[in-house]
């Protein structure tokens, strides 16, 4: 774990979305989204190809969401505990995603880290089951992450 890998997703943003460098997703009003991409993101369908990552053993269904190195380096400048997340496979869904949503600021990234560390300390089959059920409910009833 902790090694870089290619994460599969449906393209939801324009090809030049990061021409000015890496940027965080700003929600449904993000101008970089395509029309189809907005629909995919709103219904979390852009994540479906990550099931291939799960099948290949690079990801788990539940675990801390993977992050790009550019943002990991920024998080590590504020909180070195990020390295603890390398103990387990990253996940398609996570405890942090359910309660923190998408991260578009450093404060939210650090809050997500705290949720992920809580998950790491308390993970169990029962905890994973609750995360799975809540994720399913949120997707079915359209709650925005």
Name what the model sees in each region:
Residues 1-145:
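Conserved small/aromatic sequence motifs within transmembrane helices
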């Amino acid at each position: 774990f902790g090694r870089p890998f290619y994460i599969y997703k449906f393209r939801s943003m324009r090809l030049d979305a990061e021409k000015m460098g890496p940027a965080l997703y700003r929600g449904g009003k993000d101008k970089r989204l395509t029309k189809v991409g907005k629909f995919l993101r709103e219904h979390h369908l852009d994540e479906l190809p990550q099931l291939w990552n799960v099948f290949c053993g690079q990801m788990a269904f539940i675990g801390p969401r993977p992050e790009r190195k550019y943002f990991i380096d920024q998080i590590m400048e504020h909180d070195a505990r990020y390295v603890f997340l390398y103990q387990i496979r990253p996940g398609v869904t996570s405890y942090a995603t359910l309660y923190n949503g998408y991260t578009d600021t450093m404060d939210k990234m650090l809050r997500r880290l705290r949720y992920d560390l809580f998950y790491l300390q308390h993970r169990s089959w029962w905890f994973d089951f609750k995360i799975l059920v809540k994720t399913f409910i949120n997707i079915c009833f359209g709650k925005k992450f």
